[in-house]
Amino acid sequence: MSRTLSKPAGGSLAPWLGVAVIVILFDQLTKIAVAKVFAYGSSHAIAPFFNLVLVYNRGAAFSFLAMAGGWQRWAFTALGVAAAVLICYLLKRHGTQKMFCTALALIMGGAIGNVIDRLLYGHVIDFLDFHVGAWHWPAFNLADSAITIGAALLVFDELRRVRGAR
């Protein structure tokens, strides 16, 4: 009796890692450009609702734990690395599910982009500032955008999957 080894159902990691690498590259290049061109704390109006700024975030989303004394740098770094490892596992296991994997790759690219900042600088560089009048949304970066878009795609993919199961 002969046994044949079948290919894992998930498929290749390469395309999904490629998406993550593209996110990381664009994120890091934009942060480097903004840090070279703008002074810390400066604000440059681009449109009536949008500024480019240079601010540092030692915390997480919305500056959560930004004033925590330093331990958060390592906690958020560990969380980002753990997320990337879990995402690699999920990408390998579900590699044929295009929307699901695109969402995960965007999240992983964003997480690693911010981990790089934390490791290199001890903070995340944020520079996109949207506002209405005097009210400003917290500044963010391309990594944050990729994470948000990836999360929205995960929700959309799950809603689509549940609707298709009916």
UniProtKB/Swiss-Prot annotation:
TM annotation in the entry: 9-29, 37-57, 71-91, 100-120, 136-156
GO cellular component labels: plasma membrane
Organism whose genome encodes this protein: Paraburkholderia phymatum (strain DSM 17167 / CIP 108236 / LMG 21445 / STM815) (Burkholderia phymatum)
Highest rank taxon of the organism: Bacteria
Membrane topology annotation: Multi-pass membrane protein
Protein name: Lipoprotein signal peptidase
UniProt function note: This protein specifically catalyzes the removal of signal peptides from prolipoproteins.
Pfam families: Peptidase_A8
PANTHER family, per database record: LIPOPROTEIN SIGNAL PEPTIDASE
UniProt keyword list: Aspartyl protease, Cell inner membrane, Cell membrane, Hydrolase, Membrane, Protease, Transmembrane, Transmembrane helix
PROSITE patterns xrefs: SPASE_II
InterPro entries, per database record: Peptidase_A8 (IPR001872)
Active site: D126, D144
